[in-house]
């Protein structure tokens, strides 16, 4: 390659003029501003403060800070996605100004005007194209304001496709005007680039690295003698040279002639600064230069053919491997993975003092850590005398003698006359003799001598092939020493180094991948004459290159020449097998993959021990079963289905045993005895019913001698009337006593047959029935496997526990029924109930939490990503509101808006003289004109002179209970009656204190979220208070909403579902209120909090306060009882209207008394109804319950009933509510927190695991009357007007509530109560189908 002429030039600094200084400084500042602007555009966040963002409460995310956020928002608003190109245009303009700063040409104003027109056309058309075809970015239009105007103008005229075409044409014209480029020139340039790319790709595809000649990027005159190389050029090399010349001539048509040598160096796979072309592996073995896969070099050596072993079949005697070992010591190449040791001294012919240089030198390959196996050329004849076992080089480290390194004797120019050298004792092959030559040959050009290799056979291998024989050594003419020139080092080309390093790593991976794994050979056998070259897997890795070279013609002579030396060093390698297991590998093409390990097949005995029955054992097992069966009942036979069922039953029993060993019996003693009796009776009835269904299902075929199945044998159920006779899927808790012999093939038959023979099992179970209570009958039938069989076993109502004791005695199962009576704790929790059925008061033990209150992890977390507020859409909606109000001749300006999770409030500044009532009357018309579901008008906003207009959001967000509970307002509130309602329109949580309400009235239609709101309040108190602080009385007529809380320790009594019990519970609350008032008056306190403080103070003084109102006959206590801390009581009624309509007007008086006086006693009411009518929510109740919550109602009348004002009829439902707090006349709009059923069940289960409820007796029982509070009883006082009303009714002979109401001028409720008292006394009849009553009493006597 010709050397480029360079001249040393001295760099001088020239001073710039003042104008240029200012220009370059200004350009640098503009470029920095463009970089800052690009960072601001890329890091834009809609929540940052900007021109379109009015309120923000978060840290700034933009990298450019607040100015960057403002500027990015403005650019996106104007240009859309084209704003990203503005920094690029700024940098390009700076570059253009810097390049043309020295030009002093005059200014062509016409050209400037054309460029300005072109710039404007490009900007406008680009924005328009983006607006028509691209998606919007964030909440901006894709083309910005400019693109939106163009698109809205062109689409009605030309449609989207026509507008796109028109804008493209204008864009093309603008590009020409701005740049001055002709589109013909642009097309030619694009075509030239495409052709260059295709030419480059096609040449690169056809190119082969191994055929690139070194002369393409090396100067022949400087580095090599061209005439001398052509003298030794072979026919093959000449053919290849001609092909390369033709390819270069073709490439000259498309590639710059000045860059040919650079391209050749780039694609040749060779570094420009390589010193030598010999490729060595990490273990010192030369890589075959003709191996395209591993060497990565040329496959041709066109300079030399006289000594080419491929063309001349000359013996390979060149010591390349020894030279490689020396080179690894001198150069910084990778060390060999396996140890390569020196050859021990052996008496032989001396090594020649000087060796010829390596003639065949490939390009240096990668420094691999594994030896490279070079495949032998195809033209070489294979020698049958040479073969190599694999075991001899497998483990040289385990031998006491240091392994012998294979030695390659050097060869001279005449291989036929060269003697084969062996290492001498006084001069071992160390590598020092070769290092000097290698260092010289590293920088030398390719020599004229051909490398030849001679394989030196190790001493330990010789007895395997043939006996050592003396071989005559032929004289060899010594070659003339070659004067070598040191090749000058060239400067590194770093890009080529990177390419070469990458290829070197790839070749290392390939070499390591295809490295063979030797397999051990147990017994050496002599190699037959018909054996060909050894396999790849049998070649030792140390001599990888030389192991393939026996195909050369001189290998046989070299092997025979080393016979004597090999005999001396025979014990170097041995056939000792390694101690550890050798990996089994599979030979073939590709990586050596280990074969799978051998798997030991278990015997029949082992399979039988695991319960696996082989088909061959079936006959023997059936015979054994029949033999045992004949001992007890002759004639009983079983079919295959029954045998399989019994085997499944046995497996189920074993599984139950393992489950008991895993979980133990730690919770069997926690159940009270009375609960055990009730649960055991219920489970026995379920077992009987399930046995009936199973018998009907499988009663097709019975064994001979079996008695017919009778349900009378299993009649035992005190709760039979309460259970359904339908089939039930049982749920077994797998807890079984550990059995001693789990696998017995005969016993399951007895166990399976028992349910079908009710007579015999009754006789067998007579003795266990007297010893064991009925509770333990579910002690062991818990088998989750094969439910059809295992459920038939517990059909016995009396202790079927021995059914699982049978398999323990395979020979004499009769005594099994005498042994199972072991004192075992009862397990009433093991039931036959379906897992999907809810069971109230379930005693199944749970893991007791360690925290005093439930964790928030039980609730559903809110989503981490919050959708940003679309301020642009809000601005558009504000303008639309103003326009719609103007249509109704109302002038108003939207001064502010408050976006919330569900609705957005727009604050209207009305013009002077405009009344707010006008907007309230237009609420429905505004909803219609704004295309919204509902519009609520807030006439007065506290603290502001504006009118609020609440519109629903397009995308409604869900308010999660967890995010409301995880708030400082809720956590910091010390009251145990703190409840959360949801979020207001500003997104702030709304927290209320039930102790300050003090009672709550909730109303809403079905589906409005009323029950969800009640659940949210209950969960709030469960997350705030312990059972000793707050207790609940829940009344749920629908038996759906509040029944899920059954079993929590906060309950005073079970969830009340009967209306009679509900009235009794309210009466108990009134009596409890009176009792607490007496105690508080005795202690001189005014509320329950003061009472509890007195009790706590007495406890700290260690002087408890005795009950001042206790009498010896009041209770069975032997000592005087003391006062204890009283919890708050919350009475929750889910359907108040149903309670009022079912029980009667008596409940109204009880609720009124509680609402009036119960606040100080710590009793609070939460009444929920879906019918807020005046006959349900009376004036007396409303007067005493000031705090109200209104969900969506059906009409303004209902809204006025619950809130005393309209507005609830325009709510959105699904938790949207109006909350009227205590001492407040203006309701607050709140979006209720959403509670899932899974969350409720999770919290309930968490509290159930903490403890059991301590119910108070007598809450739901009525001691005064058996009929409850449904009507008049003897103890109730008659109305003062009762006698006068009776006289009026008997005289008029017409009984009606309205007549009594008009006659005595009393309220409707009082008149109705008087009529009911008359009905109870028998004066009037019951109300007929038409609503009339008959007067039964005779008329008064005159």
UniProtKB/Swiss-Prot annotation:
GO terms for cellular component: plasma membrane. Keywords: ATP-binding, Cell cycle, Cell division, Cell inner membrane, Cell membrane, Chromosome partition, DNA-binding, Membrane, Nucleotide-binding, Transmembrane, Transmembrane helix. Residues 346-386, 409-489, 604-639, 688-712, 741-862 are annotated as: Disordered. It comes from the Bacteria. The keyword Transport does not apply. This is DNA translocase FtsK. Essential cell division protein that coordinates cell division and chromosome segregation. The N-terminus is involved in assembly of the cell-division machinery. The C-terminus functions as a DNA motor that moves dsDNA in an ATP-dependent manner towards the dif recombination site, which is located within the replication terminus region. Translocation stops specifically at Xer-dif sites, where FtsK interacts with the Xer recombinase, allowing activation of chromosome unlinking by recombination. FtsK orienting polar sequences (KOPS) guide the direction of DNA translocation. Consists of an N-terminal domain, which is sufficient for the localization to the septal ring and is required for cell division, followed by a linker domain, and a C-terminal domain, which forms the translocation motor involved in chromosome segregation. The C-terminal domain can be further subdivided into alpha, beta and gamma subdomains. The alpha and beta subdomains multimerise to produce a hexameric ring, contain the nucleotide binding motif and form the DNA pump. It comes from Shigella flexneri. Residues 409-430, 449-480, 741-829, 849-859 have a biased composition (Low complexity). GO terms for molecular function: ATP binding; DNA binding. Homohexamer. Forms a ring that surrounds DNA. It is found in: Cell inner membrane. Residues 437-448, 690-699 have a biased composition (Polar residues). Residues 619-628 have a biased composition (Basic and acidic residues). Residues 1-24, 99-115, 180-1342 are cytoplasmic. Residues 45-74, 133-162 are periplasmic. Belongs to the FtsK/SpoIIIE/SftA family. SUPFAM superfamilies: P-loop containing nucleoside triphosphate hydrolases, Winged helix' DNA-binding domain.
